[in-house]
Amino acid sequence: FLQYSTFAQGATCVTGTFTLKPRPGRIKQILKTLRYVPTEAGWTWRNQLGLRNPGIFKGIDNTPWHSVMSIASLEPNDWKILYEIVPKNMSVELNISCPNVDRHPNLTKAFAKDKRKWCIVKVPPTITNKQLDRIVNLGYNQIHASNTLPTEKGGLSGKIIAPYTLGIISFLKENYPHVEVIAGGGVTDRFSRDRYLDAGADHISLGSVCFTPWKVKTIIT
């Protein structure tokens, strides 16, 4: 899966999420859990991939300098170790938004102090205002809202996330106007893109729509 964070002059690639240790079985898990399902907001994708990936060292080796590498912590000390491993000039997205990371969501402020072009924190749609306060107070000024909506059978993407993302945008822009917000969830056309931009988002991320790549160009131009 690739995710695209779109900007005025083009698109920046955000990789799939890498963890400290490899978690094999990605293709098998995609075939097993990826489904197109009906929801109250319309048909959408549901997945339960479980952060399957080849590990952080493969991520570092295969992430181009102009892309953003997504990373996640699964154990209490992982953020500290990841900070020591990841090059200090590499753009990163700290993914605290998957159900797998709920046990150890604690961020270190270490990443925030470096001069990276992008040091993004990706948050879940169900994040609280208090948790957002803490992230900003740690020094993080780029927040990506938001990841899939958790259910018993996996995370839901698409339009069902939009109300949550709009709420996060509203809170951040009212309380922390300096924070750059990357908004995503259900962006399938210019109307849904502009809905987030009009709410105050600085950038837009595209996820599920990348399954229909012919639609992407009309959104980012």
Give each language-model segment a name.
Residues 96-106, 130-179, 213-219:
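Glycine/Thr-rich beta-alpha phosphate-binding loop at enzyme active sites
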Residues 11-16, 67-71, 92-94, 119-123, ...:
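Hydrophobic faces of well-ordered beta-strands that scaffold small-molecule active sites
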Residues 53-66, 106-125, 156-183, 219-221:
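Alpha-helix-loop-beta-strand connector modules within alpha/beta enzyme cores
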Residues 2-6, 79-86, 126-138, 172-176, ...:
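Catalytic cores of alpha/beta
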Residues 31-50, 100-113, 152-163:
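Glycine-rich tight-turn/loop motif centered on a GG-T
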Residues 15-21, 94-98, 142-152, 187, ...:
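Glycine-rich phosphate-binding active-site loops on the catalytic face of alpha/beta enzymes
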Residues 1-67, 72-74:
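N-terminal capping/small domains of soluble enzymes
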Residues 1-2, 48, 68-79, 120-128, ...:
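Active-site mouth loops of central-metabolism enzymes
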